[in-house]
Amino acid sequence: MKLSYFYVAADVPDGIIPESSVVIDVLRATTTIAWALENGADSVQVFADVDELKNQAKTFDSKEKILVGERGGKKLDGFDLGNSPLGVSSESVKGKRVFMSTTNGTRSLHRVRESKSLYTMALPNRKAIAERLKSDNPKEVWIVGSGWEGSYSLEDSLAAGALASLLMDQLESVQIVNDELMASIALWKNWENDVEGCLRIASHGQRLAGIGNHDDDFACCASLDNLSVIPKQIEMGVLRSN
């Protein structure tokens, strides 16, 4: 199994459709997706464009949908929830389609939407995704970070390294293809005993802290291997627990 890591959507090669892709946005989109599906959401549909989201959401009855979105870490006007994993409680999302647009994560999902198998991962469902990849046994996996407005993010690289490290421990066939992933593995080894600390010193972590109290979000996003949910794209842009 060949593993590659791309820091942001723009780094993903053109004209190639990978066998399997894993998109990461630790703070906070893929953590929120995991918790929404864990808490009973029917599905999560992701949009890079807010207007497109609103138009598509109009086709659903109000009781069958919930709008989740942020820009710059703040809830979008007219949306039901922002991008906090704590907000997507069972009471809020159970049985509903979550229409979601965020600053960074939804762009990365859009970039690799044609992958043969597309999953989202956060630290809480790292082990579940690793087990699924072992079961699928693809020849090549692209791990794609979300970054912040097109630039590198520490926390996504931490999670990429965490996934790769776990797969390397369990599979002899794993091959690390690029230096980006090798560096991410080293990052994980350095911070694996203080995951929340790494999230807090990251520039995006500092940005979140600067706009309000996100202590509970940090703790949630830093939790490791406590969810078994596997968000998988079942149709273009739509994720469901698989």
UniProtKB/Swiss-Prot annotation:
Cofactor names: Mg(2+)
GO terms, molecular function: 2-phosphosulfolactate phosphatase activity; magnesium ion binding; sulfopyruvate decarboxylase activity
Highest taxon of the lineage: Bacteria
InterPro entries assigned: ComB-like, ComB-like_sf
Enzyme Commission code(s) on record: 3.1.3.71
Record's catalysed reaction(s): (2R)-O-phospho-3-sulfolactate + H2O = (2R)-3-sulfolactate + phosphate
Alphabetized UniProt keyword annotations: Hydrolase, Magnesium
Cited SUPFAM superfamilies: ComB-like (SSF142823)
Protein family (similarity comment): Belongs to the ComB family.
Name this protein carries in UniProt: Probable 2-phosphosulfolactate phosphatase
